[in-house]
A protein has these predicted regions:
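Positively charged, solvent-exposed patches that mediate nucleic-acid binding
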Residues: 1-114
């Protein structure tokens, strides 16, 4: 995933959590809020409940890899945060991508539905 799509600053995460809406599934919670940018900005949050540092970083890498091919399908002008749940550790890669797409569609952030 290109760096320009990344949500990095604590201030951006706080803004998205405070003003955002959410959708939930078994592997993730999606929090999304309108942003001033024209492009979509995506962040990933994996708490210590998910596992040790190695497991958390692996989950973030898998989430980024699953989202990369779909980044062009997400409507611009949004801050999006995917919050991982512990179940994501045992989930197959295909299921991760499927649930991410499903959450984005339910939130109305998928291009053909926005």
């Amino acid at each position: 995933m290109n760096r320009s799509y990344s949500l990095k600053r604590h201030k951006e995460f706080r803004y998205t959590y405070a003003r955002g809406r959410s959708q939930s599934a078994s592997l993730f919670t999606l929090v999304y809020a309108r942003s001033r940018n024209e492009s979509v900005r995506v962040g990933f949050s994996v708490s210590k409940r998910v596992g040790n540092a190695v497991q958390r970083n692996r989950v973030k890498r898998r989430m980024r890899a699953a989202l990369t091919p779909m980044i062009g399908e997400i409507s611009g002008g949004w801050n999006v945060i995917f919050i991982a749940r512990p179940e994501v550790l045992d989930a197959p890669f295909a299921e991760i991508g499927k649930q991410m797409e499903s959450l984005l569609r339910r939130a109305g952030l998928w291009r053909d539905e926005a």
